[in-house]
Design a protein with these regions (language model features):
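Secondary-structure boundary elements
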Residues: 27, 37-38, 46-213, 248
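A short, amphipathic beta-strand motif
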Residues: 315-326, 406-408
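Hydrophobic/aromatic-rich core segments of domains that either
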Residues: 26-30, 42-44, 171-193, 198-208, ...
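Short Pro-Gly-centered beta-turn/loop motif in secreted/extracellular proteins
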Residues: 353-366, 370-373, 459-460, 577-581
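Extracellular beta-sheet/turn segments enriched in Thr/Pro/Gly and aliphatic residues
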Residues: 301-311, 379-405, 605-609
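Disordered, acidic Ser/Thr/Pro-rich linker "stalks" and the adjacent N-terminal cap
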Residues: 399-461, 472-533, 537-547, 551, ...
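Short, acidic Ser/Thr/Gly-rich low-complexity loop/linker segments typical of extracellular
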Residues: 339-353, 448, 565-569
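C-terminal motif of bacterial Sec signal peptides marking the signal peptidase cleavage site
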Residues: 13-14
């Protein structure tokens, strides 16, 4: 029924010539209509507050509370812990995020439930903050409606949260508004006071009744900050990237709506590629209207996401010409995330043309449409360059190539610190356990950057003892030795200081496991042996190529992902022959790991996207 409300309201919203949006919302209220009319009557002599009430009621369809015995049981657990109000309110929102708990809850539409007294109280409290807070003196009425007035931020249970501001925070805000000229006229500066208070409510990391709780996690921290900001009279919103275009996952954060500064906070997307940035709003935004039994992806059945990509990125519009089945009314752009194609934007068909607006640059997009619930490829994927030019990636089966691949996921600079720590280490060999007159084998002079380092060794000499020696405590994934026939040799591990940890992991042929070496580590082979090759690998993400792992290469055409065959790696790179050129590729590891990214080939090398 809730989805019905969303589509019905959006459809009616687009037909304002027949009836006003307010009248349509009141029709949906059913038996609750007198309560909402009572609010309008209450403000009949206050035009501004009446406009605010109309805004809330007009956009109320589609907003709802999730409730049920499961959530009430969860609340009893939280109530027994003596958690501060604001933290408790956000903790109670976490089960609403997960399908396994959501399916146990029932939606209660606001339009049928919200009472006059509650709505009047919320409106009066919001206006009190707007008219008495010096930092809001230049806040526009439209921004007030969207970013301060709303009585909810998600699907939480409704209460009188504006009345529950922490007394210490309230006193800090009053002090600043009375005395601190550099703060009291700036929403952003006042928000720093609230931010510090919200951060002080650190719950740590925990798991309550199977629900993960972490104040460091972006969704939790955004909800916590947004409630704290609006409670204190700071206009704010949550912006989010539903899925990254160059890595797995998503992100969301809180933005301050400041009358002087741009309403974005830096440091959220600059180091990543975002196809779209959306803002959670109370008011409804355009969404695809299905015709007959047309399938609409779930993200775009929610009208409360506003496209704000232009606030963050230099964007481009993209027009695609392609024929689709006559019953198809909408097409979509998808990106590769989490080993699947995920929808990020939509367009309505107009004479076999689809126009997508404000798209993020330097991204590979996959145009798709739906037949029933089945996703189909509209045309070939393309690269949207920063200059707005699109480059179609149509596989060329007449020009084939040989690919030598070394990774399945891009190497990020912030993950190679374990390799940096290795610089300065030395490897030595000796037949004396004290390493008197030891033979110098290798110096670590550069960061291996998660790649294995293969060190050839003089096979005419034999040594019983091998030593890793360093001034630092480091973490290694592998330390391997091979004889002149390429066979692995194993010895006894000696930890001179006795402060190492998980040292057996260095010799388990698992690149994802690792051990901590405290300055020195010795391997005793029991007798002098001939070593032809020594290999070491810093702690890493296991996204390289590793001997014994099975890999499969795919390329993308109009029929989807096409396999180019499976291979077992025999070294730290893998070769695939007779590969179509000018395609999007995907290398999968069927043995281990989850992180995988698509790539193209530029100048003979992998370019990850």
């Amino acid at each position: 029924r809730l989805i019905f409300y969303l589509f019905l309201f959006t459809l009616l919203h687009s037909c304002r010539e027949a009836n006003s949006q307010l009248e349509q919302a009141l029709k949906l209220a059913g038996d609750n209509k007198p309560e909402l009319q009572k609010v309008l009557k209450h403000y009949s002599d206050d035009s501004l507050k009446r406009e605010a009430a109309i805004f809330l009621i007009e956009n109320m369809p589609g907003h709802y509370t999730l409730d049920g015995p499961y959530l009430r049981q969860f609340q009893r657990v939280i109530d027994s812990m003596g958690t501060p109000y604001l933290m408790k309110k956000v903790i109670l929102m976490q089960p609403l995020r997960y399908p396994r708990s959501r399916q146990q809850l029932r939606a209660k539409p606001d339009i049928e439930q919200v009472k006059a007294d509650y709505l009047i109280h919320q409106i009066d409290q919001a206006f009190r903050l707007w008219t008495t807070s010096p930092w809001l003196e230049n806040l526009t009425f439209d921004d007030f409606l969207e970013y301060l007035l709303p009585y909810r931020i998600g699907n939480e249970s409704l209460d009188y949260w504006r009345d529950s501001i922490d007394l210490r925070l309230k006193n800090r805000l009053q002090e600043a508004s009375l005395y601190f000229d550099n703060q009291k006229h700036s929403p952003y500066n006042m928000a720093q006071i609230v931010y510090g208070h919200a951060l002080g409510l650190d719950y740590g990391n925990d798991n309550l009744v199977g629900i993960p709780i972490s104040t460091k996690e972006c969704v939790f921290s955004s909800q916590l900050q947004l409630l704290a900001y609006r409670m204190a009279g700071i206009p704010a919103a949550i912006d989010h990237v539903p899925c990254w275009a160059d890595m797995n996952g998503f992100h969301e954060w809180t933005v301050i709506i400041d009358t002087k500064n741009k309403d974005i906070l830096s440091g959220q997307i600059e180091m990543k590629n975002a196809p779209k940035v959306y803002r959670r709003t109370y008011s409804a935004n355009p969404i695809p209207i299905p015709e007959e039994d047309e399938y609409i992806p779930p993200f775009f059945t929610d009208p409360f996401n506003r496209d704000v990509t232009d606030k963050y990125l230099h964007t481009s519009d993209v027009t695609i010409t392609a024929s689709v089945p006559v019953q198809t009314r909408h097409a979509y752009l998808a990106i590769f995330n989490g080993r699947e194609l995920r929808i990020v934007d939509w367009s309505k068909v107009q004479q076999d043309k689809f126009c997508f607006h404000s798209m993020g640059p330097d991204i590979i997009y996959f145009p798709v449409y739906f037949e029933k619930e089945y996703q189909r490829n509209l045309t070939y994927p393309f690269i949207l360059q920063a200059n707005g030019i699109t480059v179609k990636l149509r596989p060329d089966t007449t020009r084939r190539q040989t690919l030598i691949l070394t990774r399945k996921y891009p190497l990020h600079h912030n993950k190679v610190y374990h390799g940096n720590a290795l610089i300065g280490a030395i490897f030595q060999a000796s037949n004396d356990p004290t390493f008197r007159n030891a033979t110098h084998i290798h110096d670590v002079t550069r960061n291996p950057n998660m790649y294995p380092v293969i060190v050839p060794v003089d096979t005419t000499k034999k040594y019983r003892y091998w030593r890793f020696n360093h001034s630092k405590i480091v973490e290694l994934a592998e330390w391997k030795f091979k004889d002149n026939r390429g066979r692995d040799l194993t010895g006894t591990i000696i930890d001179p200081e006795g402060k190492g940890a998980r040292l057996a992991n260095l010799f388990d042929n698992d690149p994802l496991s690792h051990g901590r070496v405290s300055h020195q580590l010795i391997v005793d082979f029991g007798h002098p042996v001939c070593i032809s090759e020594m290999i070491y690998l810093p702690r890493n993400d296991a996204n390289g190529i590793y001997p014994g792992n099975e890999y499969e290469l795919f390329y993308f055409d109009l029929n989807g992902w096409q396999s180019l065959g499976c291979k077992i790696a025999t070294g730290y790179s893998i070769e695939f022959e007779n590969i179509p050129s000018n395609a999007v590729y995907w290398l999968r590891n069927h043995t281990a790991g989850k992180e995988e990214r698509i790539f193209t080939i530029q100048n003979g090398k992998q370019r990850f996207w």
